[in-house]
Amino acid sequence: MDLDPRLRILLTGALFATGGAAIKACTLPGPQISAMRAVVAALTLFLLLPEARRLPSARVLLVLPAYFGSTFLFVVANKLTTAANAIFLQATAPLWVAMLGPALLGERPRRSEWFALVCIALGMGLFFLAGEDASATAPSPLLGNIIAVVSGVSFGLLLVGFRWLGRRGKGEQSAVVAWGNLFTAACGSLVMLALDVPFGTPTPKDWVILVAIGSVQVGCAYALLVRSMPLVPAVQASLLLMIEPALNPLLAFLVHGERPHPMAVAGGALIVGAVTASTLLARKRT
């Protein structure tokens, strides 16, 4: 039996959640992890999404930078700040969807979704008030937090782009994630060269991590996402995806013993609680 599109988006979020702990376990620089993961993800997506194998259209090319920003910047942020901060700050995406949706999609958030969006903004503020110290798994928290917010802006633009492309019904969303990973691999490598970031030599464990996060955490997850986005309003989809922040910090704690600041925990609880309430209300109306 085919899963409800909302459940598929929740499963997507659960797969995304495995990335934080896995990225921190990899010894390579963040930009290199992003680029190499993208190569594996592209191969997986071209296998799973036959409609993505044709050359991208001009519409698809417009959305590729948003894909690059959301995935590349998240990996970099995750190597600089805690997994909790990286994912919760990327989870500001619904704010940007709500701001851009009326103009670009003609979709306005429901009242319950606005409540969740306000809570997201308040939660985001708590992360920057925390003033966390550097640690082994979070060597530059402030810079990582800033990059994570920009990643959230990019992810919001990506969700808007998915919804926009999905209205045409031509499989262009599939092309975005497949070609977007090739775009990310190329641009990520160029960023490393431009910033003079040394390329590391992957260990056997690094290779296992890269293949796993490329094929499952990105490849399978985005295959589910592009099949579901045309069927769910953009703001609601972005809210459903925030099951990821509930799982991501937990996995980072279990694997690395990483403990986010208490104010970050409070911000995360505020966000997840609001999203859960908003999603339940939306479910009752459908």
Regions found by a protein language model. Give the residues of each.
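Hydrophobic transmembrane alpha-helices of multi-pass small-molecule transport proteins
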Residues: 45, 67, 99, 112-132, ...
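Hydrophobic/aromatic residues within transmembrane alpha-helices
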Residues: 26, 33, 77, 103-109, ...
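Specific alpha-helical transmembrane segments that line the substrate/conduction pathway
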Residues: 32-35, 39-40, 75-108, 112-113, ...
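Helix-helix packing/entry segments at the starts of transmembrane helices
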Residues: 86-92, 162-185, 218-254
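Membrane-interface helix-cap regions at the ends of transmembrane helices
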Residues: 14-21, 39-56, 72, 121-138, ...
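Specific transmembrane alpha-helical segments of multi-pass solute transporters/efflux pumps
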Residues: 15-20, 51-90, 126, 214-232
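Loop-to-transmembrane alpha-helix entry segments
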Residues: 54-58, 87-90, 106-126, 141-145, ...
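Transmembrane alpha-helical segments that form core, pore/gating elements
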Residues: 13-16, 45, 97-98, 134-196
